Amino acid sequence: KIEDTVINIKRNHNSYNKNWKIYLASKQYINQDFIVVCSALNTEKLLEPLGHKISLEPILGQVVELKLKNKNSNWNKWPAILNYQSINFIHHRSSHLIMGATIESGVEPSLLDKQAMLLMNNTSPEWLTKSKIIHEWNGVRARPKDEPAPLLKELEKGLLINTGHYRNGILLAPYCAEWIGMKINDQ
């Protein structure tokens, strides 16, 4: 576990057969056989000096927690996550619903995009339009340009990337971890 900012990665040709040297903000370095780059938007900056072009763009997700006017006792018939028009819905307690989407380019939240999400692009049912926002938050993620997400690649011996989880990252995490483990065990 590295509890410091990685500022540079270089190939290591001199140190006990370790393939890579990781330079840290604290002016220290670590020699490693494998590096798994999971740095989202910083991935490009770390890999470009090594000659690898990875194109990622920022994409913003917005989430709201809604208090529904009426309690819903039918949550057991609701799937764990419901997706409609790229909007995710998760039931949360008997009268709460979490609603979110990761569809906005850039890093600044848009009130218009949030309103479109809340209105489900003008298809929102009445029970949803009558709900009250009790909490909201947003976050920036990395989306691959011109490639499917997530990016799972072995760029060189011992240099793996696992990034670009701009949607469904939590669902893909077990598979991504398995892929990384297989790549490391195969070498």
PLM feature spans:
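Hydrophobic/aromatic beta-strand patches that form the interior of the parallel beta-sheet core
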Residues: 2, 36, 160-162
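A conserved short coil-to-beta-strand element within the FAD-binding core of flavoproteins
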Residues: 2-21
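General beta-strand recognition
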Residues: 21-23, 98, 160-161
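Core beta-strand elements of the Rossmann-like FAD/NAD(P) dinucleotide-binding domain
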Residues: 25-34
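Active-site substrate-recognition segment that forms the wall
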Residues: 34, 39-157
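Glycine-rich phosphate/pyrophosphate-binding beta-alpha loops
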Residues: 159-172
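Internal hydrophobic alpha-helix adjacent to the cofactor/substrate pocket in enzyme cavities
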Residues: 173-187
